[in-house]
Amino acid sequence: MSFDPNMQKLYIQDVTLRDGMHAIRHQYGLDHVQAIARALDRAKVDAIEVAHGDGLQGSSFNYGFGAYTDWDWIGAVAEVLEHSVLTTLLLPGIGTVHDLKHAYEMGVRSVRIATHCTEADVSKQHIEAARNLGMDVSGFLMMSHMIDPEALAEQALLMESYGAHCVYVTDSGGAMNMDEYAARCQAYDRVLKPETQRGVHAHHNLSLGVANSIVAVQNGVVRVDASLAGMGAGAGNAPLEVFIAAADRMGWNHGCDLFALMDAAEDLVRPLQDRPVRVDRETLTLGYAGVYSSFLRHAEKASSDYGVDTRSILAEVGRRKMVGGQEDMIVDIALDMVKAR
C-alpha cells in the first residue's frame, strides 16, 4: 500500500481504555475513563477504544470481572467526546452481534473484530453486521507472530473479503522484531486491495513497541495503536506519547498535541498502575517466549497461589503455544509444576 506519512495523515488509535484494562485487572472507575478520554479527545487523537480488556462482554470468571460493565464505561466516555471516534473491540464468541448493535446505539462508530491469527473465518458474521450498521470496521489478527507472513496475509484477505476497511498486524505477545513486522506488512501488500488500510498493534515486551510501529508505517501502515504511558497488557503497548514524539521528529503528520499526551500519561494514567507497566523479568519473558500479553496477571496470581516462579509458568505457556481464551490452563500448568517437584 502506498502511504506517505509526511504528506498523508496517520490514524492514531488510543487503546488505554481497552488494552489498558488488562494492566489494572479491568478496574477503571468511571471518573478515570472520563478524565482520560477527555484528555485524549483534547489532544486530538483520532479514535479511542473502550471495553473490557477482552472486548465486549469479556467480564467473566475466565478473563476477570470488570469494576463496571462495558456499557457503563462506553456511556461515560460518550458523554465527553467532541473530536475522537468512539471505538470498541469484539471477539466473536465472547461478544455477539446483539452487543455490537447495542454499542452502536450508545454512540460507538468504529469496531475492531478480533480473532486468533488462524481463525479469521469466525469474524465473517460480525464484520458483515458492523458494515450493515454503517460502522468503520477493522479486522484484528491476534498473536500474528505465530504464523508466517504469507499465511497471515491469507487470513487478512479473508477479513477484507468480509468487508473490513482495515486489517491489523497484531503482535499480542510483543514477540516480533522489526524485520518480522516489515515482512508481514509486505505480505499484506501482496494480497490486499490498495484501498484496504493496514494497522499496527504492538506490545513493548521486548522494548520494540515504538520501533515496530515506526517500521510498520514505513511499510504502508496507516492506523497505529498506542496507549498513554504504554498502559496495556504485559509491558504495555507502544507508549502513545513516545510514538508521537518519534513521529514528530520524523516529520510525520499525526495531528496530535504531544505535550497534552505527555501530561495525560504522567498525571492521569501512571498513578493508576497497581503494578508498573514496564519491561521486567516477567514481562520480558512474555516477549521472549511469545506469550499472549494479557496472561501476565493471571500467571502472577497462579505464582502467588501455588509458589511457582511466574517466568516458569509463562515459559511453559509459550512452549504449549497457548492462545487467548486458555487462561484457565495457567492454573493447570502451575499445579503440574507443583506436582513435579
Swiss-Prot record:
Its EC number is 4.1.3.39. The lineage of its organism: Bacteria, Pseudomonadati, Pseudomonadota, Alphaproteobacteria, Sphingomonadales. Belongs to the 4-hydroxy-2-oxovalerate aldolase family. Pfam families: DmpG_comm, HMGL-like. Mn(2+) binds at D19, H201, H203. This is 4-hydroxy-2-oxovalerate aldolase 3. GO terms for biological process: catabolic process; L-leucine biosynthetic process. It comes from Rhizorhabdus wittichii (strain DSM 6014 / CCUG 31198 / JCM 15750 / NBRC 105917 / EY 4224 / RW1). It catalyses: (S)-4-hydroxy-2-oxopentanoate = acetaldehyde + pyruvate.
